[in-house]
């Protein structure tokens, strides 16, 4: 439809150009008034050549315009601009989609980092509690071992003191009873006393 309108417009413009080419010289001649026309044949010949010149000039211009294909060039340019606009719109939409996608990925990565940070803090706190518990258990064990070692040392010291006390008691008793008691009584007393000390 656009092409038909263009052709009709070309025909109308061509017709107007021919009409103007004929009417302008006629009007120019008519405006000359009623003066004496010494050689009207020469004027008509001159007018004819002018019309032919104008027609040739108009034909050359129309041919040049068609050859230049101004409408086609403009239509192609319009199509190219529309294509460029469409491609730019598609590129913008693609860029916006990628921006949205990368924004979502960045937000997801930030959430994952926050989750990992929270998990690491929780794990670090659990590790801290475990280390503290192990340290407390080790301290309790060392305290218990020290208490047992102290108890053993106390028992050992008591035993040594008892043995020493028994020895001294035997010597003292032996010195006092040595004069009053016979050798057989003496051995019996020592054996009885040693038996009691061993039972303690």
From Swiss-Prot:
Keywords: ATP synthesis, Cell inner membrane, Cell membrane, CF(0), Hydrogen ion transport, Ion transport, Membrane, Transmembrane, Transmembrane helix, Transport
Transmembrane segments: 12-32
Protein's UniProt keywords contain RNA-binding: no
Pfam families per record: ATP-synt_B
Location relative to the cell: Cell inner membrane
MF (Gene Ontology): proton-transporting ATP synthase activity, rotational mechanism
InterPro entries: ATP_synth_b/b'su_bac/chlpt
Superkingdom assignment: Bacteria
UniProt GO cellular component terms: plasma membrane; proton-transporting ATP synthase complex
UniProt keyword Membrane present: yes
Protein topology in the membrane: Single-pass membrane protein
Quaternary state and interactors: F-type ATPases have 2 components, F(1) - the catalytic core - and F(0) - the membrane proton channel. F(1) has five subunits: alpha(3), beta(3), gamma(1), delta(1), epsilon(1). F(0) has three main subunits: a(1), b(2) and c(10-14). The alpha and beta chains form an alternating ring which encloses part of the gamma chain. F(1) is attached to F(0) by a central stalk formed by the gamma and epsilon chains, while a peripheral stalk is formed by the delta and b chains.
Family: Belongs to the ATPase B chain family.
Function: F(1)F(0) ATP synthase produces ATP from ADP in the presence of a proton or sodium gradient. F-type ATPases consist of two structural domains, F(1) containing the extramembraneous catalytic core and F(0) containing the membrane proton channel, linked together by a central stalk and a peripheral stalk. During catalysis, ATP synthesis in the catalytic domain of F(1) is coupled via a rotary mechanism of the central stalk subunits to proton translocation.
Protein name from the UniProt record: ATP synthase subunit b
Organism listed in the record: Trichlorobacter lovleyi (strain ATCC BAA-1151 / DSM 17278 / SZ) (Geobacter lovleyi)
Upper lineage: Bacteria, Pseudomonadati, Thermodesulfobacteriota, Desulfuromonadia, Geobacterales
Gene, per the UniProt record: atpF
